[in-house]
Amino acid sequence: MDVTAKYELIGLMAYPIRHSLSPKMQNKALEKAGLPFTYMAFEVDNDSFPGAIEGLKALKMRGTGISMPNKQLACEYVDELTPAAKLVGAINTIVNDDGYLRGYNTDGTGHIRAIKESGFDIKGKTMVLLGAGGASTAIGAQGAIEGLKEIKLFNRRDEFFDKALAFAQRVNENTDCVVTVTDLADQQAFAEALASADILTNGTKVGMKPLENESLVNDISLLHPGLLVTECVYNPHMTKLLQQAQQAGCKTIDGYGMLLWQGAEQFTLWTGKDFPLEYVKQVMGFGA
């Protein structure tokens, strides 16, 4: 690819950043489509995020992807949020239209699309959702919009717990889905929730390097063959949770599915063109 002065820049702002497959995936897609954009990753944490957004405007970047730990903070720095992004309270995509910044969240649509592509119908189902960060709440919100009956969200009593309660209130007030929030330390409640659940989704970074030997499921007997277990983490590809799930006879969906589908939607938002899906799956080695 010969980058010229006519090319526009798209970024990814996150910390840490080195594990991300998004730059490779998006640049392969842009090159295949013959579009005059290039995608670059920038190591940006909460402290440096405000300055990074000013830089985005000054450099007239087309937009940026947003990942941990900036997804919730980023909502404060855009001019407009989609209804779904408001419900989530976090974004993973910014589109810059001549200095006017629009915030989107494709994490939820991407993850739910990956579930649907596997042949699983979420309507009327119950999901146990781990975590209350940007990715997790995006999945919960989109699942609620698309027909989940109940979401049982579990999170540690950390800085995200109050945000989880606020998220649950927003979803309960604006959709037909019922969301409850429980401390993950309550292992009895966790076990009872899993026993009646249709889907278990890990929306936390537990399982991602350097936590690849960890799982929030301490007892594999809590997993049952009727349960669909899905991951947001894709590095490593086969997390400990997915290994546990397969041993228990559960159907699983790895983090590549979410990465692919959320990235496809981002691509279209930035470029206005269709994402070369089959080509990207092939060159990236995604089985999704």
UniProtKB/Swiss-Prot annotation:
- Pathway per the UniProt entry: Metabolic intermediate biosynthesis; chorismate biosynthesis; chorismate from D-erythrose 4-phosphate and phosphoenolpyruvate: step 4/7
Q: Which UniProt keywords apply?
A: Amino-acid biosynthesis, Aromatic amino acid biosynthesis, NAD, NADP, Oxidoreductase
Q: Does the keyword Amino-acid biosynthesis apply?
A: yes
Q: Which InterPro entries match?
A: Aminoacid_DH-like_N_sf, NAD(P)-bd_dom_sf, Quinate/Shikimate_DH, SDH_C, Shikimate_DH-bd_N, Shikimate_DH_fam
Documented EC number(s): 1.1.1.282
Q: Name one Pfam family in it.
A: Shikimate_dh_N
- Tell me which residues bind NAD(+): A132, G133, G134, A135, N155, R156, R157, D158, K205, C232, V233, Y234, N235, G255
- Enumerate the residues binding substrate: K71, D107
Q: Offer one example of a GO biological process linked to this entry.
A: shikimate metabolic process
**Which reaction(s) does the protein catalyse, per the Swiss-Prot or TrEMBL entry?**
L-quinate + NAD(+) = 3-dehydroquinate + NADH + H(+); L-quinate + NADP(+) = 3-dehydroquinate + NADPH + H(+); shikimate + NADP(+) = 3-dehydroshikimate + NADPH + H(+); shikimate + NAD(+) = 3-dehydroshikimate + NADH + H(+)
This entry's Gene Ontology molecular function terms read:
quinate 3-dehydrogenase (NAD+) activity; quinate 3-dehydrogenase (NADP+) activity; shikimate 3-dehydrogenase (NAD+) activity; shikimate 3-dehydrogenase (NADP+) activity
Q: What class of enzyme is it?
A: oxidoreductase
Extract the HAMAP family matched here: Shikimate_DH_AroE, Shikimate_DH_YdiB
Functional summary from the UniProt entry: The actual biological function of YdiB remains unclear, nor is it known whether 3-dehydroshikimate or quinate represents the natural substrate. Catalyzes the reversible NAD-dependent reduction of both 3-dehydroshikimate (DHSA) and 3-dehydroquinate to yield shikimate (SA) and quinate, respectively. It can use both NAD or NADP for catalysis, however it has higher catalytic efficiency with NAD.
Which family, according to the similarity comment? Belongs to the shikimate dehydrogenase family.
Quaternary structure note: Homodimer.
Q: What is this protein called?
A: Quinate/shikimate dehydrogenase
Q: Which organism is it from?
A: Escherichia coli O139:H28 (strain E24377A / ETEC)
